[in-house]
């Protein structure tokens, strides 16, 4: 299946984890991939690994929270061809396991700047390149924390709730444009970072999930691929659940 033949996809935070899994899935189905990551060396390594498999991939270094860098990145990518898919997977956890009264304002603002402002800027400049073509797919990676809130993670929860708000607003604003914007709100996904956690910590997280397991990278990549495909033509402004039944709304 080559659903994305002759399409260019930009994946932020695409050097590792969820972002890379989505990048690889889209590449497998014919997309030319741009890995956009703050760490240029890591983004190039990810692009190289895709090229090694015979896929079309390039890399670019940019901080999603810096408007000048985001604009420059999209300007460069646009010169290479029309960009019809953008997935924003860049983000940080921020203060974790800390009561709100002990959270430093600078840490709160940094988390929101990367997760929330970054999502806004990526959506803004993705729209600028997609609207003239009257077609595009934007996907923002949110979190179950944005729907339910996680104790001890006020900055992350607030920033991801904001991402869901962006999707709702922008989806309605551009509903007739041919450009859709949606989000995925995952619970715990089995990434290399999660694999390194203590078993009891993983059990604590999976106990909240009715399926009693972590999500798999290929599962979120498969869902993401459908959301950014032409098949998903009547969905916009929506946040898709990826929580094994934890959130059913």
Regions found by a protein language model. Name each.
Residues 2-34:
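Canonical Rossmann dinucleotide-binding motif of NAD(H)/NADP(H)-dependent dehydrogenases/reductases
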Residues 96-100, 104-109, 194, 201, ...:
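Substrate-binding pocket helix/loop in short-chain dehydrogenase/reductase
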Residues 97, 148, 225, 236-249:
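Short C-terminal tail/terminal secondary-structure segment
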């Amino acid at each position: 299946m080559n659903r994305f033949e002759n399409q260019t996809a930009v994946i932020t935070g695409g050097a590792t984890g969820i972002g890379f899994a989505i990048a690889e899935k889209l590449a497998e189905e014919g997309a030319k991939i741009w890995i956009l990551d703050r760490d240029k060396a890591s983004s190039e390594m990810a692009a190289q690994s895709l090229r090694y498999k015979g896929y079309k991939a390039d890399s670019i270094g940019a901080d999603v929270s810096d408007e000048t860098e985001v604009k420059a990145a999209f300007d460069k990518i646009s010169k290479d061809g029309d960009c019809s898919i953008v997935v924003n997977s860049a983000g940080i956890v921020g203060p974790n396991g800390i009561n709100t009264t002990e959270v430093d304002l600078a840490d709160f603002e940094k988390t929101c700047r990367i997760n929330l402002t970054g999502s806004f800027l990526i959506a803004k400049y993705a729209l600028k390149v997609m609207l003239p073509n009257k077609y595009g797919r934007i996907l923002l990676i949110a979190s179950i924390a944005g729907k339910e809130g996680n104790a001890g993670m006020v900055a992350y929860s607030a920033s991801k709730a904001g991402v869901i708000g962006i999707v709702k607003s922008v989806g309605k604003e551009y509903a007739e444009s041919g450009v859709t914007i949606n989000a995925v709100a995952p619970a715990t996904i089995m990434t290399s970072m999660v694999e390194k956690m203590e078993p009891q910590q993983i059990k604590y997280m999976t106990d909240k999930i009715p399926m009693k397991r972590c999500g798999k990278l290929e599962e979120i990549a498969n869902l993401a691929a459908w959301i950014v495909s032409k098949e998903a033509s009547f969905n916009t402004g929506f946040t898709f659940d990826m929580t094994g039944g934890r959130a059913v709304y």
